[in-house]
């Protein structure tokens, strides 16, 4: 087994990830669940508010924990990657080893797994440009600031939102999204633009904006992936964003990648040969992940509406009552 990573080193900084119960079960199956629990934190309840601070809805994380027997855990992305890398056999991980032509790997390995992200080279080898990325209608900013906030949550305005999650002692993960046409020019000063868009919103949003540093802001357009007809072909499989890149609105991208990986391992263990295992994996994972991706796209559109805000708020409360994917 070889894990090829294009970066020369694992990251030391990065935003926080919410690990939902299903993903934590996957980490338990990999033998690293307790380490992630130890190095992360339990997510406290949060609210979704309007810019004036009035509450639209409350996220009942205790109900989720009662239902699934596991809370949502928050862990920094570099921590999760370090834990996963530490569980590999020493020689398995090859850094600074990008895959440029996955076809050549098929001659050297029994199985090629493309876990190479939204711009997957392996997916392009399988499908070309037949299933392109789709612009989700919004631009996002995100980062981490040196602030200690006990509770996270989101605030929804007209066509824009701002979110916060604790990211460990003295650290807070923040993100913002604004509905904009594709290719909209980037502002010359992201901090000034964020202050213009969100500076008069309820506390602690202005405090977070004041803590921003120019090199601590990431800006990107939000895309997801046109649904694929299959995640497998021959002895090649796709997982995670390579298979079902989704918008971040349900916080499920990393979680579903972890569940994919364990499902693929289970199918390989139980099936008689690799092609049969991959067909079983595709049956097991494609429909659930594409359903979640569609839900994330819908949630992003809902949070970004500019009109009929009372209808938006009522739909949000109904969606929360039904419960998020766990």
Regions inferred by a protein language model and the residue ranges of each:
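FAD/FMN-dependent oxidoreductases across multiple families
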Residues: 158-160, 168-169, 178-250, 256
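Residue-level marker for buried hydrophobic side chains located in beta-strands
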Residues: 1-4, 112, 232, 236-239
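Glycine-rich FAD pyrophosphate-binding loop
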Residues: 1-15
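C-terminal helical "tail/cap" subdomain of flavin- and related membrane-associated enzymes
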Residues: 38, 207, 229, 250-251, ...
């Amino acid at each position: 087994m070889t894990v090829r990573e294009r970066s020369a080193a694992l990251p030391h900084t990065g935003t926080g990830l919410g690990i939902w119960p299903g993903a934590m079960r996957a980490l338990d199956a990999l033998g690293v669940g307790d380490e992630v629990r130890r190095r992360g934190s339990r997510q406290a309840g949060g609210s979704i508010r309007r810019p004036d601070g009035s509450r639209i809805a409350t996220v009942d994380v205790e109900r989720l924990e009662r239902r699934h027997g596991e809370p949502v855990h928050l862990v920094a992305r570099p921590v999760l990657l370090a834990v996963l890398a530490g569980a590999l056999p020493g020689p398995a991980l090859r850094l600074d080893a990008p895959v440029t032509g996955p076809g050549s790997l098929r001659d050297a390995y029994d199985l090629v797994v493309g876990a190479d992200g939204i711009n997957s080279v392996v997916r392009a080898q399988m499908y070309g440009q037949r299933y392109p990325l789709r612009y989700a209608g919004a631009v996002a900013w995100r980062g981490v600031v040196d602030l200690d906030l006990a509770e996270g949550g989101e605030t929804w305005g007209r066509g824009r939102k701002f979110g916060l999650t604790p990211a460990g002692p003295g650290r807070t993960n923040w993100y913002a999204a604004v509905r904009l046409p594709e290719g909209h020019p980037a502002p010359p000063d992201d901090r000034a633009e964020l202050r213009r868009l969100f500076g008069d919103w309820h506390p602690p949003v202005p405090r977070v904006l004041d803590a921003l540093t120019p090199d601590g802001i990431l800006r990107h357009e939000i895309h997801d992936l046109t649904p694929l007809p299959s995640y497998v072909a021959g002895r090649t499989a796709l997982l995670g964003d390579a298979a079902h890149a989704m918008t971040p609105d349900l916080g499920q991208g990393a979680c579903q990648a972890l569940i994919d990986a364990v499902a693929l391992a289970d199918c390989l263990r139980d099936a008689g040969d690799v092609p049969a295992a991959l067909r079983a994996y595709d049956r097991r994972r494609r429909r659930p992940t594409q359903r979640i991706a569609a839900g994330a796209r819908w949630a992003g559109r809902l949070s970004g509406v500019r009109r009929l805000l009372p209808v938006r708020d009522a739909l949000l409360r109904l969606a929360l009552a039904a419960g998020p994917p766990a």
